[in-house]
């Protein structure tokens, strides 16, 4: 399954657009394990806890996007976009949304 942020795939013409596919992944962030995460964020450092949660959420959202495209018998998902949200005021979770267009290639 090809995943691309572009609307076309070089050398691979699109035969059919199958529709929009989307997925999401929610990850809890345990700042107890990374007590200084907020201080690092404040002073411009990197939070390993947040980076790890974002990476995992993005990977899970991508895999779910592929699974939904396979259900449509797609060969690829083009125009993929990721959006990140932290709905908790305390920063206790991160949500990654992935959307794209499932396509069948020639």
From Swiss-Prot:
Family matches, as InterPro entries: UPF0145_dom_sf, UPF0145_YbjQ-like
Coiled-coil positions: none
Pfam families: YbjQ_1
Disulfide bonds: none
Highest taxon listed in the record's lineage: Bacteria
Protein family per UniProt: Belongs to the UPF0145 family.
Name under which the protein is recorded: UPF0145 protein PputW619_2377
């Amino acid at each position: 399954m090809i995943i691309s942020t572009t609307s076309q795939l070089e050398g691979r013409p699109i035969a059919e657009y199958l529709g929009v596919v989307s997925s999401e992944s929610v990850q809890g962030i345990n700042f107890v394990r990374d007590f200084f995460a907020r201080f690092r964020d404040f002073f411009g450092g990197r939070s390993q806890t947040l980076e790890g949660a974002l990476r995992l959420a993005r990977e899970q959202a991508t895999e779910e996007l592929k699974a939904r495209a396979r259900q449509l018998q797609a060969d690829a998902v083009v125009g993929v976009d990721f959006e990140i949200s932290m709905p908790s005021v305390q920063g206790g979770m991160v949500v990654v949304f992935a959307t794209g267009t499932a396509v069948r290639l020639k």
